[in-house]
Amino acid sequence: MQNLGIAITGSGSAVPETSLHNEELSQLVETSDEWISTRTGIRQRRLALPTESLSSLAAAASRQAIASAGITASDIDLILLATSTPDDLFGTATKIQAELGANKAVAFDLTAACSGFVFGLVTAAQFIRTGVYQNVLLIGADILSRWVDWQDRRTCVLFGDGAGAVVLQANSSDRLLGFALKSDGTQNHYLNLAYQGTAKEILPNVKITQGTYQPVTMNGKEVYRFAAQKVPEIIDKALFEAQLTVDQIDWLLLHQANQRILDTVAQRLNIPAHKVISNLANYGNTSAASIPLALDEAVREGKIKPNDIIATSGFGAGLTWGAAIFQWGR
C-alpha cells in the first residue's frame, strides 16, 4: 500500500450546560476559590446531568467536526473514541456511530486516560498512512464527575465533563510531522480509577467477584513531578522526529490538567506564555476531552489559523504520555 499524508481538517466540541464554580464547591468540602485557583488555575467546571450521556456529548462534538471538515457522516470510515468513562464498558463508539448515522464506519473505544486523544491521534494516523481508511473521526470525551469522591477535595476540585472531536483525512502532504508515545506501568498507582470487587458466594464453594470501581485517587505531587519532567522530554523527542525547533512552534497545546503544569512545561521548553493555549479556568480537567476541546475553541476564536504548527502532549494515568507535532488544516 502507498503511504499517504494526513491532515486534521475539522474540529468540534461540546460541554454540559451545568457549571459548578469554586465558590459552590466550598459548600461541599473545605476549600475556597482562592485555594483552588492558585493551586490549579481552575475557576469552574461543567458537570453532566443524570439525563446526559457521554455518547450524546461526543455525538454533538462529532457533528461539529464533521461539518467543519466539509464531509458527511456517511463519509466516515473509522470512529475512534478515546475515553475512560464510557456509557457501556463493552464500548460506546458504536453507539455514537448509530447516533451520527455513520453506517459504513468501523467504531471502537481506546483507553489511555488523559493521554487518550494523543494516543488516538497516532493510532488514527496509521490507518490513513497505510491506505486502509481515508476519513477518520477521532473523539476525546469523558464524564469524570461520575467517578470522583465529592468529599475528597484533592480530586473533586479538578475534574469536569466534556467532549471534543476532530476529523483526520488522507492528504497529499503529511501534516502530522512527528510524534512519540510512552508508558510506565510501574507508576500506575499514582493515578487510578481502580476496580474494586466484592467477593460473593453464588453456590457452596463457588465464589465470584461482583465488580464495581472505586472513585478516582491521585498522588498530586508525584503526578506533577512526572509531568514536569516527562512532558518536555517527549515534546523534544517529537520535535526531533519532525526536524523542527521549539522556535518554530506556533502553539503549545497540552492536556489541561493544572495551570502550574502548563506553565512549568512551557518554561522548560522556553516557549513564551502567549503561545500556550489554556481554557482550564472554565472547564477543569476533562481528561481525554481536554486537548480537542481547547483546540476547537482556539480554532473557532481565530487563534489557530491554517498552517500553524502545534505541539500537543497528553499525559496521565497508566502512567502514559505522548506528544504530536502537527500543522492545522490541509
From Swiss-Prot:
* GO BP annotations, alphabetical order: fatty acid biosynthetic process
Q: In which pathway does it act?
A: Lipid metabolism; fatty acid biosynthesis
Return any one Pfam family short name. Answer: ACP_syn_III
- Name the GO cellular-component terms: cytoplasm
Query: Where does the record place the catalytic residues?
Result: 114, 255, 285
The protein's matches in CDD domains, at most eight in alphabetical order, are given as:
KAS_III
> EC number(s) of the enzyme?
2.3.1.180
Q: Reaction catalysed by this chain?
A: malonyl-[ACP] + acetyl-CoA + H(+) = 3-oxobutanoyl-[ACP] + CO2 + CoA
Any one Gene Ontology MF annotation carried by this entry is:
beta-ketoacyl-acyl-carrier-protein synthase III activity
Give the span(s) annotated as ACP-binding: 256-260
What is the uppermost EC class here? transferase
Entry keyword set: Acyltransferase, Cytoplasm, Fatty acid biosynthesis, Fatty acid metabolism, Lipid biosynthesis, Lipid metabolism, Multifunctional enzyme, Transferase
Question: Known InterPro entries for this protein?
Answer: ACP_syn_III_C, ACP_syn_III_N, FabH, Thiolase-like
Q: Report the subcellular localization.
A: Cytoplasm
Its biological purpose is as follows:
Catalyzes the condensation reaction of fatty acid synthesis by the addition to an acyl acceptor of two carbons from malonyl-ACP. Catalyzes the first condensation reaction which initiates fatty acid synthesis and may therefore play a role in governing the total rate of fatty acid production. Possesses both acetoacetyl-ACP synthase and acetyl transacylase activities. Its substrate specificity determines the biosynthesis of branched-chain and/or straight-chain of fatty acids.
Record comment regarding domains? The last Arg residue of the ACP-binding site is essential for the weak association between ACP/AcpP and FabH.
What NCBIfam families does the record tag this protein with? fabH, PRK09352.1
Family stated for the protein in its record: Belongs to the thiolase-like superfamily. FabH family.
Oligomeric and partner information: Homodimer.
**What's this protein's name?**
Beta-ketoacyl-[acyl-carrier-protein] synthase III
Q: Which gene encodes it?
A: fabH
